Amino acid sequence: MISKSIIYQIVSVLAVGLYFVPMLVVLMKKLWSAVPFRLFALYWLICALANLVEYMHLSPRALDLYTVIYNMLDIPIVLTIFSFSSSSPVVKKFTRIVAPALLAISIVNCIIRGFNTDSLEYVLGGELLIVLSVIVWEIILKLQKIKLTGPVKGLLLIYAALFFEYGTFVVIYIFDYFLPGTSTTTDNFLVYYLSSLVALPVAISGFFIKGIKTPPQSAVDRMEHPFSRSIPDYVQI
């Protein structure tokens, strides 16, 4: 019978490997000019590099501090990406205000309560609610479009993957902070990596949607979306 440790090692290696794939697809398909796809690929590349730290022999204190810093940055980074990828001026404004605000709150909270995982209990819970709300918000806005272009479908797949990942984080968060002792750290990480194995193939399929090119903005679009002139929302045929 295969032990849990072996299963964990296999799952973690596969998950970390998948984190590199979106960036490889962006480079192979020359999607660098497609801003949302590039930013999400960069995000998962950062996740891949961040998860490699697990294979380093760090002291428990150093690993705890690293986990705190990672949790402080993760959701603000994702919200910042949404501020560039969304076509809604309201979502753009909201995420551009909330992302730095959450980071500032996390820093102040850690300065007061200490740089340890326990100090992020309530801040992290609030961040998870906000990022899940923004993801659902964006999915609803995309589905309201009369015609779903290929790139919009690609972004919907990415959003669905993110929603699943952060939904799993909520479960881990509840067990970690409110049901201590119910599961081990290894169990939580195993669930985390398993969620990545499910979510990342969905997200990666979004990068393979046909017709991803930076679209020229029509005069009508420029009038209707004056706030989105500087950075293209998404890419289409």
Segments from the language model and where they lie:
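Terminal, non-globular segments
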Residues: 1-237
